[in-house]
């Protein structure tokens, strides 16, 4: 799980993909923050080689407050449906750096989760490490 902002580390992404591959785990790359224009476009371009290698790369906006164009809304909705279908009936690990929207999407999938969220630090271009524990959620998808 990565986002257009804060900028993701390709090294961290590659390590996660290698670990998943070594364990026979299907990896899906989710790029969040579709509403961030040029930042999103740059991040999407950086993910093109992963798409060429056969990884599923989905574009979404996890924030219900995001200002999306009608086209972006369609893309986000289609990606969410594709992601939910891929996760249905499976144990899933949502992995990614701080500030990428993992807790935001979990709160939407599990309304009772109450996972705390914050804005990212503009000064540091990173998340504020809001989620400090690992939690197992049951999702009826």
PLM region descriptions:
Residues 15-18, 45:
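Alpha-helical scaffolding segments of alpha/beta enzyme cores, especially the outer helices
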Residues 87, 105, 137:
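Conserved RecA-like P-loop NTPase ATPase core
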Residues 17, 21, 51:
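Anion (oxyanion) recognition and catalysis
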Residues 36-100:
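Canonical P-loop GTPase G-domain recognition
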Residues 23-27, 53-56, 89, 141:
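Short glycine-/polar-rich loops that comprise or flank the Walker A/P-loop
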Residues 98, 103-104, 108:
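Walker A/P-loop
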Residues 111-141:
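Switch I (effector-binding) loop of TRAFAC-class P-loop GTPase G-domains
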Residues 1-13, 25-28, 34-40:
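Conserved Switch II/interswitch segment of TRAFAC-class P-loop GTPases
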